[in-house]
Structure formats: C-alpha cells, structure tokens
Amino acid sequence: SKKKEDFEKVRKLNTKDFFYMPGTILHLDSDNEYIDKCNEYYKSQNVKAYLYQYNESEFKDNVSKLIMKHNPKVLVITGHDAYYKKSKNNEKYKNSKYYIETVKEARKIKSNYNDLIIIAGACQSDFISLIKSGATFASSPKHINIHALDPAIIASIVALTDINNEIDLEETLNKTKYGSDGIGGIKTKGTMISVYPRKE
C-alpha cells in the first residue's frame, strides 16, 4: 500500500538528512569556579547552556523567571552541601533544603517530567527528598561527595539524547565519578529534537 511505502521511505531517511536540536540547559550554581568548568564542558559537548551564579539560598527566588526567560529542557541546580550525621537538631544537611525548595518552585511552572529534566543537589545532598520534591536526577544516595562536573555530564547526555529514546540510567550514572553512589535518578527520555529535512 502507498501508506506502507511512505512509511518505509521515512524509515530509510539517512541521518545526514536531519539536523539536530539538543535540549537547552539552565544551570544554577553557587560556585563561580564550578560554573567556569561546567561552561567549558558544555561548549565541548556543543550544547546550549545558560549559567547563573547565586548563593544556594537565592536559587528559589530566581529559578522561575529564568525558566520563563530561557525555556530550558534541562535544569541543573547545584553548588555546595554537607551531611551532618550527628546533628543535634533536625538540620542534617547544610543546603539541601534550598535545592529542594528550588525543585518544587521549578515544578510549579513545569510539572510534567518530560517537559523539564531536573538535576539537583551537590556533595552529600538529601537524595530521597530531592527525588520526592520533583528532581529527575539527584545526589547523593550514599551521602558522598560528587565531582563538580557530574551534574553537567548528566545534563549533556540528556540534552544530546533523542526525545523518543529512553536514557540508559546505569550507563549514564557510570559516566560520573562515583556512579550510583554519588547520583541516582528515575527513568526518563532525552530532550534532543531531530528535524527533517536538513536545510543546507
């Protein structure tokens, strides 16, 4: 049938006939040095990223306007944190509460997990609470330190994976310094759009 012939034609389209639009990344960080490192990494991966430096306590008040401004497909919220195992009050984490409230704020605007992939947390952050608050990827399951580039590595993989393809969680986490001990996540798809025909 003609419909079947058309389908076969589309299926056989050569990848060079397409052009690709990776998902845009919005990256909030409390550390200027980390921002510079991550910016270099994003450039090396050819992904579009907007990076902003704020103190962790300022993330929540700025995330909404930045999402509205840049309409990202991937949001990174990171900086510094610490886990106090023997804390005498309920504050077991230095900055996790700021990451959690920022994730919640972002989800008010983009509640659909496919519309915005959120990578949140820093060294020793409250993994379970971050996932429960709406993060797609978070640190740190084993309360260990993570490498400064780890969130950027995951963000780039998500940005460069086709929107119809599922992210290989195990493979992705294994590309970070400490694997699933440092960062965990939920099943999700990529954010890259393939456009046909390619315009010369």
Regions found by a protein language model. Give the residues of each.
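A short, glycine/acidic-enriched catalytic loop
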Residues: 83-102
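Conserved acidic segment of CheY-like receiver
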Residues: 23-32
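Extreme N-terminal leader/targeting regions
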Residues: 1-18
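Short beta->alpha junction loops
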Residues: 51-58
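Proline-aspartate-enriched helix->loop->beta-strand connector
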Residues: 67-80, 135
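Short helix-loop-beta junction
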Residues: 39-50
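Catalytic cores of nucleophile-dependent amide-cleaving enzymes
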Residues: 98-146
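C-terminal functional extensions of proteins
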Residues: 145-200
